[in-house]
Amino acid sequence: MPRMALGLAYDGSSWQGWQTQPHRQTVQDTLEAALARFAGIDGSLPTVCAGRTDTGVHAAMQVVHLDTRLERRAESWVRGVNAFLPPSIAVQWAQPVPDDFHARFSARSRTYLYLLWRGRVRPPLWAGRAGWCFQPLDVQAMRQAASALLGEHDFSSFRSSQCQARHPVRTLHRLDIDERGPFLVFTLRANAFLHHMVRNLMGALLQIGQGRQPVAWMPAVLAARDRRLAAPTFAADGLYLSAIEYPPEYKLNDTDGSGQLLSPFTFA
């Protein structure tokens, strides 16, 4: 059966995560219902995503695949499915892909951004869309601590107790911290992420930025492989799934020919 890939963006503020759940409003359920209406069938069209996002987490570039015999032009998929979606979810592009393409398992890497507002007063115009820290932060100390996380490590200290991953080893390729006016933009790219890994890393970095822990605390916590020794999980508000990287042979809708699917909505 022919396979389609779709690129999505969504505001996660009003959704209880990506994954379908009984009696809950999720992005997956809403998308699959819209796909079924577009295809003119009862029920839903099952999808597989590149990365499941939690309650309150946003996506500037989520990728899904689905199998369907429906033949439409790419632009018809975009406009047609969006006609049945709420304003907080939108298909950005659609493209036929080979049968061996898998939105999750074909991905080489995922990139997340965390948008943090620095200010004495919470930012009402960014409510639900940016994290907030009212205390002064030592950005250089956070950058030094972040460097200890790069490479392949056992990230058990930064995984949720509900994490279902078969093993905790991940390769973190990038962890940048950029100052953009009142914002700090954290960019993290890895082959894959554990459940709550980004938010747990954020919590630890802020402990160091606020001077509550020294820079040397980060590699010690990483080496301990014990979630109890790390910082609390930080808020979901400012977290965005922002890019997915696939092998170039799939010729997806990337912006630079590298296979890295980027979004016009992010700060990257």
Curated annotation (Swiss-Prot):
Keywords: Isomerase, tRNA processing. Belongs to the tRNA pseudouridine synthase TruA family. Homodimer. Substrate binds at Y112. PANTHER family: PSEUDOURIDYLATE SYNTHASE, TRNA PSEUDOURIDINE SYNTHASE-LIKE 1. InterPro entries: PsdUridine_synth_cat_dom_sf, PsdUridine_synth_TruA, PsdUridine_synth_TruA_a/b_dom, PsdUridine_synth_TruA_C, TruA/RsuA/RluB/E/F_N. GO terms for biological process: tRNA pseudouridine synthesis. GO terms for molecular function: RNA binding; tRNA pseudouridine(38-40) synthase activity. Its EC number is 5.4.99.12. It catalyses: uridine(38/39/40) in tRNA = pseudouridine(38/39/40) in tRNA. Formation of pseudouridine at positions 38, 39 and 40 in the anticodon stem and loop of transfer RNAs. It holds the Pfam family PseudoU_synth_1. HAMAP family: TruA. It comes from Bordetella petrii (strain ATCC BAA-461 / DSM 12804 / CCUG 43448). This is tRNA pseudouridine synthase A. The active site is at D54 (nucleophile). SUPFAM superfamilies: Pseudouridine synthase.
